[in-house]
UniProtKB/Swiss-Prot annotation:
It comes from Yarrowia lipolytica (strain CLIB 122 / E 150). Component of the PEX1-PEX6 AAA ATPase complex, a protein dislocase complex that mediates the ATP-dependent extraction of the PEX5 receptor from peroxisomal membranes, an essential step for PEX5 recycling. Specifically recognizes PEX5 monoubiquitinated at 'Cys-6', and pulls it out of the peroxisome lumen through the PEX2-PEX10-PEX12 retrotranslocation channel. Extraction by the PEX1-PEX6 AAA ATPase complex is accompanied by unfolding of the TPR repeats and release of bound cargo from PEX5. GO terms for biological process: protein import into peroxisome matrix; protein import into peroxisome matrix, receptor recycling; protein unfolding. It comes from the Eukaryota. Belongs to the AAA ATPase family. This is Peroxisomal ATPase PEX6.
Length: 1024
């Protein structure tokens, strides 16, 4: 059974360079190991160290709360004493570890035995442990441990891999080990200063609540600050004392100051407060003054330094939540819960957030039968916030007035009126602090986000009174690319509210009802300016007519509505997945159009970084903060997920988390440990491994490839292609150069992105295209001619555009046109009345021209044809399919043997098999497909021969059993009890190949081969 999890305890660690264990005082040892286990282990957390594993022992000479250990190889810390948190763990055995050795030491330390021998002085003899990231003797470093980051080393079980250290730039995480704050190693006088003078401190926001000795029901959590204990000594106060703070403009507040919980890496001379208080203070530097000569400590309430207000007025900050009547019950209950149990310290102008669950609140507000649900449930899992602002205290609206205490038993609380104050921008982490989902940050990789940010700032700034009438249409060819999300994120960064109006929800029984609903929603939104109004799915109410080109009757009236609600400090935005369906009259009303495509590789990299960013976590493993193992590359994840949308990437990370949990659950069953211990051994996080991601991405590909057209990377390597060494070199020169050296093509030099394979059928043209995609980790699109044809005018050309757009979305990508002569024949020679083939060729030419310009980088077009003489001449001009490679029939027996070796890589060949002898019997008219048929037939012959031999053995066995008076046996019984390894495994013999060769006829005749050689002479001779 897994061991019981133990609660952590605090202690003081003394650095001991010679210790191989973590030695504990008798008191600490008894607290952690009262049951006296045979092999005690402990993990400790300290500033800059996250749960390092050590074997534990008892040292009776140490003081009560003291322990000692050698931590140089864990963190390289120079500190002699440090506060730590100790935790008993039951470690697992490390199955595999990778250790890198400096190049100067590699000649003497290049085997696992030599490395282990060199590490003996550093490892405990009885219970050696190894930790990922450890800097070992002689400059060795532990790069990777499996299945967790640290654990026991067991002889015969733990496998050690030794690799030479690469001479590279120092990684950022290793550089961080030596980038310490020098103040951390200065000596502080830990006694409280006798003089209680004011001190200037910086202010910084917290990302999560910090527990204190005081209950939130007793003390105002929005009037707390946290500093390092050394800073408290400098101020001359105790933890829990009440101090006064003053900003540069003279505004004063009281603050209860606590010591930041140890261990921590927070900065000195910085006071950390809640993001709400940080915004309300409004200054990054404050003057902190202790309250008089006496300490106002934990036992003292705030009313000992603040008087209670007689009356306080709150105004709703206009926004989507405070103007929605269905949420009134929710935020009124939240206000009551905020003020009733606790005395709150407030000033005029302070913002007060009331978080709540909008889905549950709307259900309660709209359905009377749900009124029995307790209102406390509204704050359990919040997703929205209603903001309020203190507008008056004791009748004074002066922001410079003093701070008061709101006591529900003495203070009259009035909620009324509205204000259009801007809310707190998301640069201050208030969403994380309140437990809301964080909005993604759109960095420099998202160029369209900068454009939207400029539009939001201009339309909602002080210039908005000039009636700029700013409007923007965001459109995309695929759903779920983040049109509404980028608007929410950018507006939140600017502290601006967003009103989202779904046009599907506006559609009524008639035009008047639809327009009336729209006007009502716009009236509510425009009353909250400055804000952003988003009309989602605009094409649903502003459709272009499909018949005569005339707009529907509602369109002209909708134009008037949009004109009436332009300007006034509001950015009018609309989103659409198909802008071509929107009426031109409506579309022309939008001054800006921004296309948002499927995320590119750099954008996917940033999305994955956001999704895998470790948060504060929670109590259960499903809420534990996540981290990436050192061998997980975000760049590789971005490459493998080409063509996927942000919701798909989110699903991948969620699936990966579940797979990691399943992996740890299985590990707990196989070992005597708990999930809590496994998280501790992974430095307190749920660590995601490459195998977790591979399975999740494979699932996403399999599930969504058909519905969203996500291309896949094929699994065909050069080993599967034989006899094409010369062609391989030309391909590498054409494709590898722009991928490895893209900066060479940034100065106007056009790259060659089109390759045309031509030659007899069955020579491996399709196989070679897949090998290209696999070799360079490119996604692969295969396009067949009939897939592009459509009966409607213009749709065939649109299909060509969509193919190339998908390729650009999934780059780096290979677009493979099989049987290109059926897709792009010579123009003017077709008999179709509509000229559809000519238009397809023209569209294909236009798209190929775009591949060598901006936006086409990373997209390579490969065509294959048996009849290059039927292709349109324009396709073969420079910038299109200008690299023509002839894939012919092997003209030597050595090349034929190479092809057969590639085809039989996974065969079990008998000792008598000679591929050289077989190839010498083959004529020079055999294509690659013929050799594939030869090898397949040989395998089939071997299977038939083996099956006949098995049948003969079973027949003989049953005959003997019948003579002995026993029942005959079945084939299944024979395979379970009598079959040998040779009966189960099929081995291909020389006779199988010879039989297949004798029965095979070439697919290309000598006359046809001469025809293809003439074509080669025509194109390679006349086109050079």
């Amino acid at each position: 059974m897994p061991s019981i999890s133990h609660k952590p305890i605090t202690a003081k660690l003394v650095a001991a360079p010679d210790a191989t264990k973590l030695e504990l005082s008798s008191y600490l040892y008894q607290q952690l190991f009262s049951d006296k286990p045979a092999e005690p282990y402990v993990a400790f957390e300290a500033p800059g160290i996250k749960w390092a594993l050590y074997p534990a022992s008892e040292d009776r000479s140490l003081p009560q709360y003291t322990c000692k250990a050698d931590i140089r190889h864990v963190a390289g810390s120079l500190k002699k004493f440090m506060p730590v948190v100790l935790k008993r763990v039951n470690p697992v055995t490390i199955e595999h570890a990778i250790v890198t050795v400096p190049a100067s030491q590699y000649e003497t330390l290049n085997t696992p035995e030599q490395v282990l021998k060199a590490l003996e002085p550093q490892l405990d003899k009885d219970r050696p442990v190894i930790r990922q990231g450890d800097v070992l003797l002689n400059g060795c470093r532990v790069r990777l441990c499996e299945p967790v980051n640290q654990g026991k080393v067991v002889k015969g079980t733990t496998k050690l891999t030794v690799a030479k250290e690469q001479e590279t730039i120092q990684p950022a995480d290793e550089a961080a080990d030596v980038a310490f704050d020098i103040a951390e190693f200065l000596d502080f006088d830990t006694s409280v200063a006798k003089t209680r003078e004011s001190t200037n401190l910086q202010v910084a926001p917290l990302e999560g609540a910090i527990p204190t000795p005081l209950s939130d029901r007793f003390d105002d959590c929005e009037s707390r600050g946290f500093v390092k204990s050394e800073t408290m000594s400098k101020l001359g106060v105790f933890s829990g004392d009440i101090v006064s703070i003053k900003t540069k403009n003279g505004a004063e507040r009281v603050l209860r100051l606590f010591a930041y919980p140890e261990p921590n890496t927070v900065k000195y001379d910085v006071v950390y407060v809640s993001p709400i208080l940080y915004h309300n203070i409004g200054d990054k530097e404050i003057e902190v003054t202790p309250n008089g000569e006496t300490h106002k400590s934990v036992g003292e309430a705030l009313d000992s330094v603040l008087e209670a207000a007689e009356e306080v007025k709150l105004a709703r900050v206009l926004g989507p939540t405070t103007t929605d009547r269905t949420f009134q019950t929710a935020y009124h209950a939240g206000l009551q819960a905020y003020f009733k149990p606790v005395k709150r310290a407030v000033r005029v102008g302070d913002l007060i957030p009331i978080p709540f669950d909008s889905i549950l609140a709307r259900t309660i507000g709209e359905d009377p039968e749900m009124s029995h649900i307790p209102l406390e449930a509204l704050a359990v899992k919040p997703d929205s916030v209603a903001w309020f602002q203190v507008t008056s205290l004791n009748g004074s609206e002066d922001p410079a007035s003093k701070q008061y205490l709101v006591d529900s038993s003495q203070t009259k609380l009035i909620e009324g009126g509205t204000t259009s104050s801007a809310v707190i921008p998301t640069s201050v982490p208030w969403r994380e602090y309140l437990g809301l989902d964080t909005l993604p940050k759109f960095g420099s990789e998202f160029a369209y986000a900068d454009k939207i940010r400029n539009l939001v700032q201009i339309s909602t700034s002080a210039l908005s009174h000039a009636k700029l009438n700013t409007s923007v249409l965001l459109h995309s060819a695929k759903r779920g690319v983040g049109k509404s999300t980028v608007l929410r994120s950018v507006a939140a960064q600017c502290g601006i509210s967003v009103f989202e109006i779904s046009c599907f929800g506006l559609i009524g029984d008639n035009e008047a009802q639809t327009l009336g609903t729209l006007r009502a929603k716009l009236d509510r939104a425009y009353g909250c300016s400055p804000c952003v109004v988003v009309l989602q799915h605009l094409e649903s109410i502003a459709k272009k007519s499909d018949q005569d080109g005339k707009d529907e009757g509602i369109v002209s009236k909708l134009v008037d509505v949009l004109a009436d609600y332009s300007g006034h400090g509001v950015l009018l935005a609309a989103t659409s997945n198909d802008p071509d369906k929107i009426s031109e009259a409506i579309r022309s009303r939008f001054q800006f159009e921004i296309e948002i495509g499927v995320p590119s590789e750099p954008q996917r990299r940033q999305i994955f970084s956001h999704l895998t960013k470790s948060g504060p976590g929670g109590d259960s493993i499903r809420n534990a903060p996540i981290s990436l193992r050192s061998d997980v590359s975000v760049e590789n994840l971005a490459l493998q997920s080409a063509g996927l949308t942000p919701p798909d990437l989110t699903a991948i990370v969620q699936t990966t988390r579940l797979r990691a949990i399943d992996r740890l659950n299985k590990l707990t069953k196989d070992s005597d440990t708990t999930l809590d211990d496994l998280l501790t051994l992974s430095h307190g996080t749920l660590q995601l491994t490459p195998s977790d991601f591979d399975d999740a991405i494979a699932d996403a590909r399999q599930k969504y490839s058909d519905s969203i057209g996500a291309p896949r990377i094929p699994n065909v390597g050069w080993d599967d292609v034989g006899g094409m060494e010369g062609v391989k070199k030309d391909i590498l020169d054409t494709i590898e150069t722009p991928l490895k050296y893209p900066h060479w093509f940034s100065d106007g030099v056009k790259k060659r992105s089109g390759i045309l394979f031509y030659g007899p059928p069955g020579t491996g043209k399709t196989l070679l295209a897949k090998a290209i995609a696999t070799t360079f980790s490119l996604n692969f699109f295969s396009v067949k001619g009939p897939e592009l044809l459509n009966m409607y005018i213009g749709e065939s050309e649109a299909n060509v555009r969509r193919v190339f757009q998908k390729a650009r979305d999934a780059k780096p990508c290979v677009v493979f046109f099989d049987e290109l002569d059926s897709v792009a024949p010579q123009r003017g020679n077709q008999g179709d009345s509509g000229g559809v083939m000519d238009r397809i060729v023209s569209q294909l030419l236009a798209e190929l021209d775009g591949m060598s310009t901006a936006g086409g980088e990373g997209v390579f077009v490969v065509g294959a044809t048996n009849r290059p003489d039927l292709l349109d001449e324009a396709l073969l001009r420079p910038g299109r399919f200008d690299k023509m490679l002839y894939l012919g029939i092997s003209d030597t027996h050595e090349k034929q043997q190479t092809i057969m070796e590639a085809l039989t890589r996974k065969f079990r060949l008998a000792a008598d098999v000679s591929l050289e002898a077989i190839s010498k019997r083959c004529p020079f008219t055999f294509t690659g497909a013929d050799f594939y048929a030869l090898c397949s037939d040989a395998m089939l012959n071997a299977m038939t021969r083996t099956a006949n031999e098995v049948d003969a053995k079973i027949k003989l066995l049953n005959k003997n059993r019948e003579e002995a008076g026993e029942e005959p046996v079945s084939i299944r019984w024979w395979f379970d009890h009598e079959a040998t390894k040779s009966d189960i495994e099929v081995e291909v013999a020389q006779q199988d190949f010879e039989k297949a060769k004798d029965e095979l006829s070439p697919s290309v005749s000598a006359e046809e081969l001469q025809h293809y050689l003439k074509l080669r002479q025509q194109f390679e001779g006349g086109k050079k």
